Amino acid sequence: MSLFKGKTLMITGGTGSFGNVVLNRFLQTDIGEIRIFSRDEKKQDDMRHDFQVRMPEVADKIKFYIGDVRDLQSCKSAMHGVDYIFHAAALKQVPSCEFFPMEAVKTNIIGTDNVLTAAIEEGVEAVICLSTDKAAYPINAMGKSKSLEESVAIAKSRYSGKTKICCTRYGNVMCSRGSVIPLWIDQIKAGNPITVTEPNMTRFIMSLEEAVDLVLYAFEHGENGDLLIMKAPACSIGLQAEAVCEMFGGNKDDIKVIGIRHGEKMYETLLTNEECAKAVDLGDFYRVPADNRGLNYDKYFKDGDVKRNKLTEFNSNNTKLLNKEEIKAKMMELTYIQGRLAED
């Protein structure tokens, strides 16, 4: 963590699952300060108390700022003296955003513009924006708003001066707040059938630790305007549900199919065909550099570029699909799953 030695890191939306994992990983390093910027004072108070109890020797490194990414001034006020930002604040529930799309616009698009405007004005060194696979070929309000969030970030990077701006894009983060596995476990423990939208639906899966790894990789290796993704595996929702049933004593014959919700797709895409054309393979990651052409297109009519990669699209159907035992093994790596199993 030498890059963070003595530095001040700010996490927008920092009381969520991502922020908690960052704190657990960073607090006992040589980082100087971590600022949690969010609008929910109750969650901030709960987080403050939790870390004072669990990690009292380093809890004073955490500073809490109540504010909203929708408010530019509160962003600026919280950023005085900040070196780096992980921008995680977002509305991310697909059905909710379908019913309230303008709220997604205010938080995911305008909020991101505010964060980046404030970061550039305050001389922040680097901002990593967290995005989602739903931003690729978006069909729902949440995905469309996150796609525009990425566009805002890339546009800002062209005029960001010393501030490096990168985006990360990833799929379903297992056991994060609002995700499906905790719901299934609760349903099993209550003696109810577990509800599945569509068994044949596929989704990328990764752990919260891997989500943080991706952000740190982007921070260390990304260039201004880059989009970075991790080569995540995927699984079918039906097989994942069966795995949870077998791990927690549920009856897989009681799985109840309820149908696809508002705005959902049968599979998700991490890299579109167009992005694959210029993607750089970095082993466990792909990097998509920003299109740094200007608005003067005359020269491009004369001097084209026919080079492109063989990869045509990276989605949850053509990545590595995990079998049931592999799904179980991946879930068993999670502290949350270990804790829920220990309840019995």
Task: Outline where the language-model segments fall.
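Rossmann-fold scaffold of SDR-type NAD(P)-dependent oxidoreductases
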Residues: 12, 79-88, 129
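Conserved residues in the N-terminal Rossmann fold of short-chain dehydrogenase/reductase
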Residues: 38, 65-66, 106, 198, ...
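Strand-loop microenvironment adjacent to phosphate/nucleotide-handling motifs in alpha/beta enzyme folds
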Residues: 121, 151-344
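Residues in the short beta-alpha loop(s) of Rossmann-like NAD(P)-binding domains
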Residues: 40, 50, 133, 233
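Conserved Rossmann-fold cofactor-binding substructure of NAD(P)-dependent oxidoreductases
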Residues: 63-84
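N-terminal Rossmann NAD(P)H-binding glycine-rich loop of SDR-like oxidoreductase domains
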Residues: 7-29
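Conserved glycine-rich Rossmann-like NAD(P)H-binding loop of the short-chain dehydrogenase/reductase
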Residues: 30-43
